[in-house]
């Protein structure tokens, strides 16, 4: 479907002009190079916000960034997904991972140090060289032949400690590095330890570095088997309260609760919850290859909007600067007035406040620049980006839909993702409507004597009870009529508007399934069909 799935990006263009492209990846790259990049270069966007995008940024596989305090289980989580050790992996209760490790697919197992990694044009890490040797000495790529890594890559980050000394001693701007990765990954997973929940100051700053990437963030409350149900409720509440103070978004973040390692659960009270949460998280990760093109398109749109706003800010500062005297005083005045300038530009160009960069960070950066060397506003560059946003995005969305339709669904496979897809350990196997699927005896038979007693109190005529009498008993379940109507439709196998004793027992069994919290089947599974109705049941078309 996309270039990183084996199909060549770019390719031949269709007839219809330079804007017609053959692949989504080629279209995104072309739009960026022709429409957005000239605007970025004219107003020093790369110095203020983010380095220029390269081919590898458009062609790389979906990436997941793991962030958390030390010993929350980040490296163990990767080991759990891959079901395999990887080069550079260190696990322990003390702070172990002191480097950023990009875990990627490779035909042979090995590792590449950061300085060599940032000169490889095939890897999307070349722009990390701007963080210097202090960072590059703490960055490596771990490659291994693993089925999971054929579809995704994972970035393991150093465990975050509390304290100012640890932050300073890194030798590089940790939050800036996280922000760089956040702009390029498909999913950001924040890991918390349910047994020792804490959000340090540096972790808070790290989370704030993800501003504008809220849609990518997922939260994992790990090691939840180490606390009982009552404690887990308190921990979950405390986590949501703490996150609410750090992440400024009205939407509630999705939190996955579980124990993500291949060891026995210490507390099995919530086993069913943990399994359901793990499957939800797996489905979210498995969907990343399908959504990668949409994510890249969304990131390009966000980048283009920010580049436009940046151009308005820089050109305004240039326009306000005097030509001869008082330049430094005017510069200080403009920097202090930046919040007012933001409001003025919002009104003048009808731009949302959410498109503007953070005021404080922008003020700090502007201190280092000579405003007289900024460029005045170039309307043609702005018009090119506006034209892209208005007219060029829609065809790409259509192309994404076409590629998804023409190409089989690609899901992440291998590792932990294969452990619950087949056999009795598949989620929901032998539960709810699936109970008794591999048994010879009719599963309803074990409770049928109880149901028969009820049946004969409902005045059966010729071995059947009417819909009116059946309703009197079924409504005692307090289920809504819409659900009871579906149960009636499933239980009335011969569609005669009445229930015999087996059909009534089936209806009571389906009610029990629903009351236990399981979903009803859309059609009656063969193993639930009453024995006396199995030959007469009409075959599905």
Swiss-Prot record:
Binding site for Ca(2+): 492, 494, 496, 498, 503
Residue positions where Phosphotyrosine is found in the record: 451
G5 motif as annotated region, ranges: 246
Residue span(s) of domain EH: 447-535
Positions of the UniProt region annotated as G3 motif: 156-159
Domain EF-hand intervals: 479-514
Main location: membrane
Residues with PTM N-acetylmethionine: 1
Keywords (A to Z) from UniProt: Acetylation, ATP-binding, Calcium, Cell junction, Cell membrane, Endosome, Membrane, Metal-binding, Nucleotide-binding, Phosphoprotein
Subunit-level organization: Homooligomer, and heterooligomer with EHD1, EHD2 and EHD3. Forms a complex with EHD4 and MICALL1; the complex controls CDH5 trafficking and coordinates angiogenesis.
Protein name in UniProt: EH domain-containing protein 4
């Amino acid at each position: 479907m996309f270039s990183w799935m084996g199909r060549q990006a770019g390719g031949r263009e269709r007839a219809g002009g330079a804007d017609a492209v053959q692949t989504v990846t080629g279209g995104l790259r072309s739009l960026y190079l022709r429409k957005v990049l000239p605007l970025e270069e004219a107003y020093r966007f790369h110095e203020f916000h983010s380095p220029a995008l390269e081919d590898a940024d458009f062609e790389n596989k979906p990436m997941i960034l793991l962030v958390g305090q030390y010993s929350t289980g980040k490296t163990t989580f990767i080991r759990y997904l891959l079901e395999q050790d990887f080069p550079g992996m260190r696990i322990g209760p003390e702070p172990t991972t002191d480097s950023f490790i990009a875990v990627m697919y490779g035909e042979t197992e090995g590792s590449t140090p950061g300085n060599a990694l940032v000169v490889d044009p095939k890897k999307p890490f070349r722009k990390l060289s701007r963080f210097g040797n202090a960072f590059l000495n703490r960055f490596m790529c771990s490659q291994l032949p693993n089925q999971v890594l054929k579809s995704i890559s994972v970035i393991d980050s150093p465990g975050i400690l509390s304290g100012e000394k640890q932050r300073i001693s890194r030798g590089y701007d940790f939050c800036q590095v996280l922000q760089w990765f956040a702009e390029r990954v498909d999913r950001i997973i924040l890991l918390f330890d349910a047994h020792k929940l804490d959000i340090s100051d540096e972790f808070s700053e790290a989370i704030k570095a993800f501003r504008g990437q809220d849609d990518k963030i997922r939260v994992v409350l790990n090691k939840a088997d180490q606390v009982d149900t009552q404690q887990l409720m308190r921990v979950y509440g405390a986590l949501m309260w703490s996150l609410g103070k750090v992440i400024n978004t009205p939407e509630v973040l999705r939190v996955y609760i579980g124990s993500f390692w291949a060891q026995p659960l210490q507390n099995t009270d919530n086993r069913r919850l943990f399994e359901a949460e793990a499957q939800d998280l797996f489905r979210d990760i498995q969907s990343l290859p399908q959504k990668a093109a949409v994510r890249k398109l969304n990131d390009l749109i966000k980048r283009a909007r920010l580049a436009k706003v940046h151009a308005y800010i820089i050109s305004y500062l240039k326009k306000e600067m005097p030509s001869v005297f008082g330049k430094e005083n005017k510069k200080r005045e403009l920097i202090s007035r930046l919040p007012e300038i933001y409001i003025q530009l919002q009104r003048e160009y009808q731009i949302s406040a959410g498109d503007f960069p953070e005021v404080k960070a922008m003020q700090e950066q502007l201190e280092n620049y000579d405003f007289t060397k900024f460029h005045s506003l170039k309307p043609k560059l702005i018009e090119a980006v506006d034209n892209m946003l208005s007219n060029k995005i829609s065809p790409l969305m259509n192309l994404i839909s076409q590629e998804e339709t023409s190409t089989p669904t690609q899901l992440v496979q291998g590792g932990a993702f294969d452990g619950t897809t087949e056999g009795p350990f598949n989620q929901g196997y032998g539960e709810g409507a699936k109970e008794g699927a591999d048994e010879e005896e009719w599963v309803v038979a074990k409770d049928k004597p109880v149901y028969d007693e009820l049946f004969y109190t409902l005045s059966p005529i010729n071995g059947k009870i009417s819909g009116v009498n059946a309703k009197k008993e079924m409504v005692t379940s307090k289920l809504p009529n819409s659900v009871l109507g579906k149960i009636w439709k499933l239980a009335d196998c011969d569609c005669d508007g009445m229930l015999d004793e087996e059909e009534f027992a089936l209806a009571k069994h389906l009610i029990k399934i629903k009351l236990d919290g399981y979903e009803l089947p859309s059609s009656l599974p063969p193993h639930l069909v009453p024995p006396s109705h199995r030959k007469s049941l009409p075959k599905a078309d």
